Amino acid sequence: PESYTAVRSLLTPWLDRLWQVPGNHDDRAVLRTVFHDRISGTADQLIQFDFESAGWLCLGLDTHVPGAVAGRISAAQVDQIRSRLQTSSASRCALFMHHPPVLLNSVWMDAIGLAGRELLGALCTAEPRIQLICCGHVHHEFHGQLATAAVRTTPSTGIQFAPDSDTPKFVPGCPGFRIIDLTPGGYTTEIQRISTPSIPITN
Protein backbone atom coordinates (compact mmCIF):
# COMPACT_ATOMS: atom_id res chain seq x y z
CA PRO A 1 0.00 0.00 0.00
CA GLU A 2 2.86 2.40 0.73
CA SER A 3 4.06 2.39 -2.89
CA TYR A 4 0.57 3.06 -4.24
CA THR A 5 0.06 5.81 -1.68
CA ALA A 6 3.32 7.45 -2.74
CA VAL A 7 2.30 7.28 -6.40
CA ARG A 8 -1.11 8.74 -5.59
CA SER A 9 0.57 11.63 -3.79
CA LEU A 10 2.85 12.33 -6.77
CA LEU A 11 -0.07 12.22 -9.21
CA THR A 12 -2.46 14.32 -7.14
CA PRO A 13 -2.60 17.16 -9.73
CA TRP A 14 -3.86 14.65 -12.33
CA LEU A 15 -6.23 12.56 -10.22
CA ASP A 16 -9.31 13.85 -12.02
CA ARG A 17 -8.02 12.37 -15.29
CA LEU A 18 -5.99 9.42 -14.05
CA TRP A 19 -6.67 6.04 -15.66
CA GLN A 20 -4.95 2.82 -14.68
CA VAL A 21 -4.44 -0.79 -15.68
CA PRO A 22 -2.50 -3.26 -13.51
CA GLY A 23 0.78 -4.94 -14.36
CA ASN A 24 2.21 -8.23 -13.19
CA HIS A 25 3.59 -6.71 -9.97
CA ASP A 26 0.27 -5.18 -8.96
CA ASP A 27 -2.46 -6.23 -6.55
CA ARG A 28 -5.92 -5.30 -7.80
CA ALA A 29 -7.51 -5.16 -4.35
CA VAL A 30 -4.84 -2.85 -2.92
CA LEU A 31 -4.80 -0.70 -6.06
CA ARG A 32 -8.58 -0.33 -5.75
CA THR A 33 -8.34 0.62 -2.10
CA VAL A 34 -5.78 3.38 -2.62
CA PHE A 35 -7.39 4.72 -5.81
CA HIS A 36 -10.97 4.09 -4.66
CA ASP A 37 -12.20 7.27 -6.33
CA ARG A 38 -10.72 6.33 -9.71
CA ILE A 39 -11.29 2.57 -9.94
CA SER A 40 -14.74 1.01 -9.79
CA GLY A 41 -15.59 -2.59 -8.97
CA THR A 42 -14.57 -4.74 -6.04
CA ALA A 43 -11.72 -7.01 -4.94
CA ASP A 44 -10.13 -8.85 -7.88
CA GLN A 45 -12.44 -7.72 -10.69
CA LEU A 46 -10.65 -6.55 -13.83
CA ILE A 47 -9.40 -2.96 -13.75
CA GLN A 48 -10.09 -1.39 -17.14
CA PHE A 49 -11.11 1.99 -18.54
CA ASP A 50 -13.02 3.48 -21.44
CA PHE A 51 -13.14 7.10 -22.56
CA GLU A 52 -13.10 9.16 -25.74
CA SER A 53 -10.92 12.16 -26.51
CA ALA A 54 -10.02 14.10 -29.67
CA GLY A 55 -11.75 11.57 -31.90
CA TRP A 56 -10.03 8.61 -30.20
CA LEU A 57 -11.63 5.74 -28.32
CA CYS A 58 -9.22 4.92 -25.49
CA LEU A 59 -9.54 1.51 -23.87
CA GLY A 60 -7.50 0.20 -20.95
CA LEU A 61 -7.14 -3.59 -20.80
CA ASP A 62 -6.33 -5.60 -17.69
CA THR A 63 -3.82 -8.35 -18.60
CA HIS A 64 -2.82 -9.14 -15.00
CA VAL A 65 -2.79 -12.80 -13.90
CA PRO A 66 -2.54 -13.08 -10.09
CA GLY A 67 0.65 -14.84 -9.04
CA ALA A 68 2.11 -14.89 -12.56
CA VAL A 69 4.61 -12.75 -14.46
CA ALA A 70 3.09 -13.43 -17.87
CA GLY A 71 -0.22 -11.85 -18.81
CA ARG A 72 -3.41 -12.86 -20.55
CA ILE A 73 -6.14 -11.29 -22.63
CA SER A 74 -9.33 -13.32 -22.85
CA ALA A 75 -11.80 -13.87 -25.67
CA ALA A 76 -14.37 -12.02 -23.57
CA GLN A 77 -12.12 -8.96 -23.37
CA VAL A 78 -11.55 -8.99 -27.12
CA ASP A 79 -15.30 -9.27 -27.66
CA GLN A 80 -15.78 -6.25 -25.39
CA ILE A 81 -13.35 -4.24 -27.52
CA ARG A 82 -15.19 -5.30 -30.66
CA SER A 83 -18.56 -4.35 -29.18
CA ARG A 84 -17.29 -1.00 -27.98
CA LEU A 85 -15.89 -0.19 -31.41
CA GLN A 86 -19.28 -0.97 -32.93
CA THR A 87 -20.98 1.57 -30.67
CA SER A 88 -18.33 4.28 -30.93
CA SER A 89 -18.23 7.00 -33.57
CA ALA A 90 -14.53 7.65 -32.87
CA SER A 91 -12.37 7.51 -35.99
CA ARG A 92 -9.41 5.97 -34.16
CA CYS A 93 -8.81 3.66 -31.21
CA ALA A 94 -5.88 3.38 -28.79
CA LEU A 95 -5.39 0.43 -26.45
CA PHE A 96 -3.44 0.62 -23.20
CA MET A 97 -2.23 -2.58 -21.54
CA HIS A 98 0.71 -3.81 -19.50
CA HIS A 99 1.84 -6.84 -21.54
CA PRO A 100 2.72 -6.24 -25.22
CA PRO A 101 0.60 -8.23 -27.71
CA VAL A 102 3.61 -8.94 -29.96
CA LEU A 103 6.89 -10.86 -29.70
CA LEU A 104 9.97 -8.76 -28.99
CA ASN A 105 12.79 -11.05 -30.21
CA SER A 106 13.81 -11.59 -26.59
CA VAL A 107 13.73 -15.26 -25.57
CA TRP A 108 13.12 -14.76 -21.87
CA MET A 109 10.79 -11.78 -22.23
CA ASP A 110 8.67 -13.45 -24.90
CA ALA A 111 8.28 -16.42 -22.55
CA ILE A 112 6.54 -14.14 -20.03
CA GLY A 113 4.52 -12.24 -22.60
CA LEU A 114 0.81 -12.16 -23.38
CA ALA A 115 -1.34 -15.25 -23.76
CA GLY A 116 -4.24 -14.69 -26.15
CA ARG A 117 -2.37 -12.18 -28.28
CA GLU A 118 -3.54 -13.98 -31.43
CA LEU A 119 -7.13 -13.06 -30.52
CA LEU A 120 -6.24 -9.40 -30.30
CA GLY A 121 -4.20 -9.68 -33.49
CA ALA A 122 -7.21 -11.00 -35.37
CA LEU A 123 -9.33 -8.10 -34.13
CA CYS A 124 -6.67 -5.55 -35.12
CA THR A 125 -6.53 -7.07 -38.60
CA ALA A 126 -10.30 -6.76 -38.93
CA GLU A 127 -10.57 -3.32 -37.33
CA PRO A 128 -8.14 -0.72 -38.78
CA ARG A 129 -9.39 1.95 -36.40
CA ILE A 130 -7.12 0.36 -33.78
CA GLN A 131 -4.04 2.43 -34.57
CA LEU A 132 -2.03 2.55 -31.34
CA ILE A 133 -1.25 0.04 -28.57
CA CYS A 134 0.76 1.31 -25.61
CA CYS A 135 2.36 -1.14 -23.17
CA GLY A 136 4.85 -1.53 -20.35
CA HIS A 137 6.30 -4.74 -18.89
CA VAL A 138 9.54 -4.95 -20.90
CA HIS A 139 11.50 -2.16 -19.16
CA HIS A 140 12.78 -0.67 -22.42
CA GLU A 141 11.56 1.27 -25.44
CA PHE A 142 10.28 -0.88 -28.30
CA HIS A 143 8.51 -0.10 -31.57
CA GLY A 144 6.48 -2.86 -33.20
CA GLN A 145 3.39 -3.39 -35.32
CA LEU A 146 0.21 -5.44 -34.98
CA ALA A 147 -1.79 -5.21 -38.21
CA THR A 148 -2.40 -1.45 -38.66
CA ALA A 149 -1.68 -0.69 -34.99
CA ALA A 150 1.66 0.71 -33.87
CA VAL A 151 2.86 -1.03 -30.69
CA ARG A 152 4.90 1.17 -28.35
CA THR A 153 6.44 0.08 -25.07
CA THR A 154 7.76 2.37 -22.37
CA PRO A 155 11.00 2.42 -20.38
CA SER A 156 10.79 1.47 -16.74
CA THR A 157 10.54 4.09 -14.02
CA GLY A 158 13.19 1.94 -12.29
CA ILE A 159 15.77 -0.41 -13.80
CA GLN A 160 16.11 -0.98 -17.55
CA PHE A 161 16.39 -4.35 -19.33
CA ALA A 162 18.48 -5.01 -22.43
CA PRO A 163 16.40 -5.54 -25.58
CA ASP A 164 16.95 -8.57 -27.83
CA SER A 165 18.41 -10.58 -24.94
CA ASP A 166 18.19 -14.34 -24.38
CA THR A 167 18.40 -13.91 -20.60
CA PRO A 168 17.51 -11.08 -18.19
CA LYS A 169 20.19 -8.42 -18.34
CA PHE A 170 20.18 -5.00 -16.72
CA VAL A 171 21.62 -2.10 -18.69
CA PRO A 172 22.53 1.46 -17.70
CA GLY A 173 19.73 3.84 -18.43
CA CYS A 174 17.74 6.62 -16.88
CA PRO A 175 14.20 5.89 -15.69
CA GLY A 176 11.66 7.16 -18.17
CA PHE A 177 8.06 7.48 -19.27
CA ARG A 178 6.15 7.99 -22.50
CA ILE A 179 4.13 11.07 -23.41
CA ILE A 180 1.32 10.52 -25.91
CA ASP A 181 -0.60 13.35 -27.55
CA LEU A 182 -3.79 12.20 -29.26
CA THR A 183 -5.22 14.60 -31.84
CA PRO A 184 -8.07 14.39 -34.37
CA GLY A 185 -5.44 13.90 -37.08
CA GLY A 186 -3.41 11.18 -35.38
CA TYR A 187 -0.93 11.13 -32.53
CA THR A 188 2.60 12.02 -31.50
CA THR A 189 4.63 10.32 -28.82
CA GLU A 190 8.02 10.72 -27.21
CA ILE A 191 10.07 9.29 -24.37
CA GLN A 192 11.11 11.52 -21.49
CA ARG A 193 13.80 10.44 -19.01
CA ILE A 194 15.02 11.85 -15.74
CA SER A 195 18.60 13.10 -15.85
CA THR A 196 20.25 10.58 -13.52
CA PRO A 197 19.71 6.83 -13.06
CA SER A 198 18.24 6.28 -9.61
CA ILE A 199 19.04 2.58 -9.19
CA PRO A 200 22.53 1.01 -9.43
CA ILE A 201 22.62 -2.08 -11.65
CA THR A 202 24.35 -5.42 -11.09
CA ASN A 203 24.13 -8.36 -13.49
Segments (PLM) and residue ranges:
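Alpha-helical scaffolding within the catalytic cores
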Residues: 35-49, 138
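Divalent metal-coordination and catalytic microenvironments
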Residues: 7, 23, 61, 81, ...
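Binuclear metal-dependent phosphoesterase catalytic core
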Residues: 123-125, 142-203
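Active-site-proximal beta-strand elements of phosphoester/diester hydrolases
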Residues: 55-65, 94-96, 149-155, 190-192
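Catalytic metal-binding/acid-base residues of hydrolase active sites
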Residues: 25-27, 64, 100, 137-139, ...
